[in-house]
Amino acid sequence: MQKPSIPKGTRDFSPEEMAKRNYIFNTIREVFHLYGFQQIETPAMENLSTLMGKYGEEGDKLLFKILNSGDCFAGISDEELMEKNPLRFAAKACEKGLRYDLTVPFARYVVQHRNEISFPFKRYQIQPVWRADRPQKGRYREFYQCDGDVVGSDSLINEVELIQIMDEVFHRFGIRVCIKMNNRKILSGIAEIIGEADKIVDITVAIDKLDKIGLDNVNEELRSKGLPEEAIERLQPIIMLQGSNQEKIATLKKVLSASETGLKGVAELDFILERISHTSIRAELELDLTLARGLNYYTGAIFEVKALDVQIGSITGGGRYDNLTGVFGMEGVSGVGFSFGADRIFDVLNQLDLYPEGSLKTTQLLFVNFGQKEEIHLLPLIAKVRKAGIRTELYPESTKMKKQMGYADAKKIPFVAIVGENEMAENKINLKNMLTGEQTLVTIEELIERF
């Protein structure tokens, strides 16, 4: 008989892992609600016409396509089958696919429900996505995304609030972070003033690797992309700019004085930093001119969050974008959004052991089962305990005490309630602390007060 297994690139989550994941998602939800965000969900499957062409040719290959039910070969000729062209086959045999991310379904949602939505629309979404990628360490075919966006508003106050949300979430987790920020317009201005505006993608892809590969290798990559030495020399002092955020802003105003686009980006960052100075954020906030994520997507501010006490990639990222819904025929809907990296946050909290003790325990109290007479006596007591909000179990069978205690140990249940004939006669409960072994005779009211 074949041993049961799961597809490569997917995961099972144990009760303990789910308790940790729920702590992460519930914390994020609470903060989103504080800022007026509303939750939506979209179907796991979308029409392929919604998904195809939105992620580039490589992205289209990574879409999980769903075969049409019934005769999926209907309308496909023998010649087309013999051709063995997967994309052409999928175009006829598949009308639906699993969502690749939460952004395109969100854009579809906004267009489809535009008459019901109040703009600006603050939305968050926590759902799994699927990618037909090659599984490897840290890369999965099924994983959760946790996105927040404000659409239908150009106000930079939205960027300020997103920084506050990131700061509050990581403060609640107890993770020390640095929130890095840049602006797509500044990157365009830099490429413009060094005379290489048409090579902005090559420039930004290279400088984004500065932390990982060092300046010499960045320069070598720029040379390989055809940048002249003069342009590379002019770029050096800009990307290596030091000082406080305000000192960097002052320098950029001078350096980018000949670029209208660049100066607009500087003004936007200056506004965000000035407004943030009137809040009480605890995270480090750093203007990083090498930050260049999502270049083909973001049009204004760019954000990235790094954990300070763990060597790991970014744990949150986002930015300002224009025309989110243009691909669906609704022009001019701009917004700003970001995504929490749930799996990386999970890893950071594990490495730093930052999960609050109460967040991981399911059952707080186990009642030992001695038999039918005791069960009848215990059921109203257990109902009273649960009504007080104490997570409680009654062991389902009257088996050996050792087995019941072993169950409590295995589930890390901190307290066990023992009610035998003597306790029933006195209308008391023998409460055992499983950590210390201490036992105390208490009334039901005294038991409830202890939790």
Curated annotation (Swiss-Prot):
It catalyses: tRNA(His) + L-histidine + ATP = L-histidyl-tRNA(His) + AMP + diphosphate + H(+). Its main location: cytoplasm. Disulfide bonds: none annotated. It is an enzyme of class 6 (ligase). Its EC number is 6.1.1.21. One of its GO terms (cellular component) is cytoplasm. Coiled coil: none annotated. Keywords: Aminoacyl-tRNA synthetase, ATP-binding, Cytoplasm, Ligase, Nucleotide-binding, Protein biosynthesis. One of its GO terms (biological process) is histidyl-tRNA aminoacylation. InterPro entries: aa-tRNA-synth_II, aa-tRNA-synth_II/BPL/LPL, Anticodon-bd, Anticodon-bd_dom_sf, His-tRNA-ligase, HisRS-like_core, HisRS/HisZ, HisRS_anticodon. Transmembrane segments: none annotated. Belongs to the class-II aminoacyl-tRNA synthetase family. Homodimer. This is Histidine--tRNA ligase.
